[in-house]
Amino acid sequence: MKIVDLLAYQVLDSRGQPTVAVKLFLENDQSVVAMVPSGASTGTKEALELRDGDANYFFSKSVKLAIQNVNNIIRPHLLNKNVLNFFELDNLLINLDGTENKTKLGANALLGVSIVIVKGGAVAASKPLYQYIKEDLMHNYDEHYYAPIPLMNFINGGAHADNNLDIQEFMIVPLNAISFSQAIQTGSEIFHELAKILKANHLNTAKGDEGGFAPMLNDNYAALELLVRAIKKAHYFPSKKQGVCLALDVASSELYENEKYVFKKALSHNTNLEQTSFSSDEWAKYWSDLASQFPIISIEDCFDENDWNGFSLFLKNNPHIQSVGDDLYCTNLKYLQKGINFKATNAILIKPNQIGTISETLDVIKYAQENNINTIISHRSGETEDTFIADFAIGVGAGQIKTGSLSRSERIAKYNRILEIEQELKDKLVYEPNKFFKFN
C-alpha cells in the first residue's frame, strides 16, 4: 500500500511542552498518527531532540524546525513508497540524517515518522499493531504473546517532582498476578491505599510528572516504608517471591558531581539522612543495604552513566537484583555491547526516542534478548496519549513495561491498551513473571 502524504505538526506533551506529531496518509483514505514523547532527566548519549531555541515561542521549546524537516526534507522521499517496506524506509530516514546522534534532522522528527510507518504497515497488512510488530518486524510467528509486567511508579521524586526525594521513581512490581488485568487490579488497590495512608498522615497527595504521589518525606526509607504499608493494607504480601515487590529508578547521573554521589534535595531540605555524599563503593553499599531491608527486585541507573566499573561491581555482588541500564545505554547498540563486555547490568531500559528510529531500537532489543539481558519498554516523563509502546512491548516480547502510575490519562492509556489486547488475545497472552525475573 502506497504512502499518499505525510504531515508533521506541533502538539503538546503531558507537561504542556511542544512535541512532534506526524500523520501518514495511505491509499483508500486511511491514515495513522504518531506523537513523540520527551524526557526530563536525559542521558548525554541520547540522540538529539531538536528544539528551536527561539525565546519568542514556548520559551525556546517549540519544535518548528523538526516539523519543517519532516514536511520539507523527509516527506518527498516517502511519497508513493510502499509502507510495508519498513526496514527500507527506516534506513532511508537514517541516511537522510546521516549523523550518529540525529543532529541534522532531529531524533524527534525521525522517530515520529518511523513510528507512523510502523502503524501504517499494520493497517496495510490488516493486522493489529502488536501482531505486525511481532511477525513482520521481529519475524516471530509463535501464536503466544507475553504480557509485560508493569513497573508502576507510585512515588515520584528527583527531576519528576517538586519534593525533597532524590530517588526519581519508587515503583511496585506485581509478581503475584497471574494475568495483566490482575496485575492492574493489584496496582490500583495499592495505589488507592497509599493515597489513604498519605492523607491520614497529613502528607501531600499532589502528583508528579508520571502520575505518582510527590510527598515531602524525611528520607528514602520513609518512601519505601509507605509503599510496604500500602501493599499490606491492600491485603497483598510484600515479597520478592511471587508477592508484590519494589523497584527504584535512582537516575544517579542527576546526583553525580565532582566524582561523588550526592543526595542534593536532601541537603537543600535538611532531611534526616545520616550521609548525603558517597564514593562509588559507598554508593554501591547504600543500595545493597537498602535492597536487603526492603523487597526491592529492580534498581535502574544506580550509578552515573559513565561509571561502568560501579555498575559491574554492583551486579557481581547483587546477582539477585535486576540492575537496569538507562542513561548507561540510551537504547544504543554500541553502548549495550560495551555493557555486556563489562557485565555491567542484566537489564536495559528501552526508550525509542533515545536513538531516534524503530529499526535501531529493534536492533538493541534483539541483541539484548540474544544475550539474556532483560528488556523493559519505557515511556518518558513528557508523554502523550499515543499508545504505541503498549503494542510495542507485547510485539517485541519485552516482558516488562514502565509507563508511570495509575493516574494521568497519558499513562493510563497505555495500561488500557494492554487490557484491550488481553481481551483480544485471551489465553494467548501469557503473564509469566518467573520468565523475566529468574534471578530473584
Swiss-Prot record:
One Gene Ontology term from the biological process aspect of the record: glycolytic process
Catalytic class of the enzyme: lyase
Main location: cytoplasm
One GO cellular component, as annotated: phosphopyruvate hydratase complex
Superkingdom, natural source: Bacteria
Disulfide bonds: none
Enzyme Commission designation: 4.2.1.11
Positions annotated to bind (2R)-2-phosphoglycerate: 168, 351, 380-381, 402
Cofactor requirement: Mg(2+)
Pathway(s): Carbohydrate degradation; glycolysis; pyruvate from D-glyceraldehyde 3-phosphate: step 4/5
Annotated catalytic residues: 210, 351
UniProt cross-references to InterPro entries, sorted A to Z: Enolase, Enolase-like_C_sf, Enolase-like_N, Enolase_C, Enolase_CS, Enolase_N
Cofactor binding: number and manner: Binds a second Mg(2+) ion via substrate during catalysis.
PANTHER family according to UniProt: ENOLASE
Protein role: Catalyzes the reversible conversion of 2-phosphoglycerate (2-PG) into phosphoenolpyruvate (PEP). It is essential for the degradation of carbohydrates via glycolysis.
The protein, known as: Enolase
Lineage: Bacteria, Bacillati, Mycoplasmatota, Mycoplasmoidales, Mycoplasmoidaceae
Gene name as annotated: eno
